[in-house]
Amino acid sequence: MIEDKRWKGVYSFEDSPFIMEILTQLRDKNTDSIEFRKGLVKLGRYMGYELTKTMEVEKVKVETPLEETEGIIVKDRRNVVIITVLRAAIPLMEGLIKVFEHARVGIVSAVRGKAPEFKIEMDYVKIPQIKPEDTVIVADPMIATGSTLTRVLGEVKKYGEPKRTIVLGVLAAPEGISKIKSEFPDVEIFVAKIDRELDHKGYILPGLGDAGDRAFGEPLKLSTLPQVHHIE
């Protein structure tokens, strides 16, 4: 885990060969949807494991079959709320749940419009109550312009003030990180890697393409369906 010196509280996992290997597979344009989804699940699980290293632990006594010894529990692991940004974050959440099995889950549907406005449409929000002892993890694979996540983070704040708020992603552009940190300076950001920049359409370069489309298939636009002529 490496803290990026350009911002406070921004970390990447570029020092993890295993996470970088999974990312390489996700970047490959020849990786099919099944393997892409599997890769996101793996990243969710292993980045979740890395997150536990930043959480509060408590020493406990435990009885083995032979004698008493000392162990620990990760206290914060039992007080987690995962916010899933549809649809690309579903596999990430699946991986995170394997680490934070007690987590409560919120769902947000947020769609980013086209350049240059990048207007955000949010039409579905289901978030549980957030308590002072909670760690909120907002999962979204791609932190591009930051417009979607700043809107989601603003919505999450309405449900309570947690102990920590974390944004967990696969890739981030510097532009998106700067936007989030300017509006929510206390939010921590953890990503597999910080990429170079955005293109004019707001896509991360070198990136991995549209994570939602690659994981679940490109959605069909109804206007492309052949017209059916009814004979009366």
Curated annotation (Swiss-Prot):
GO molecular function terms listed in the Swiss-Prot or TrEMBL record: GTP binding; magnesium ion binding; uracil phosphoribosyltransferase activity
PANTHER family: ADENINE PHOSPHORIBOSYLTRANSFERASE (PTHR32315), URACIL PHOSPHORIBOSYLTRANSFERASE, CHLOROPLASTIC (PTHR32315:SF4)
Residues that hold 5-phospho-alpha-D-ribose 1-diphosphate according to the record: 87, 112, 140-148, 210
Organism name: Pyrococcus abyssi (strain GE5 / Orsay)
Protein purpose: Catalyzes the conversion of uracil and 5-phospho-alpha-D-ribose 1-diphosphate (PRPP) to UMP and diphosphate.
Protein name (database record): Uracil phosphoribosyltransferase
Biochemical pathway: Pyrimidine metabolism; UMP biosynthesis via salvage pathway; UMP from uracil: step 1/1
Class of enzymatic activity (EC top level): transferase
Protein family per UniProt: Belongs to the UPRTase family.
UniProt xrefs under CDD domains: PRTases_typeI
Catalysis: reaction(s): UMP + diphosphate = 5-phospho-alpha-D-ribose 1-diphosphate + uracil
Residues involved in uracil binding: 204, 209-211
Any single Pfam family the record assigns to this protein: UPRTase
Annotated cofactor note: Binds 1 Mg(2+) ion per subunit. The magnesium is bound as Mg-PRPP.
Binding site for GTP: 38-42
Organism superkingdom: Archaea
Upper taxonomic lineage: Archaea, Methanobacteriati, Methanobacteriota, Thermococci, Thermococcales
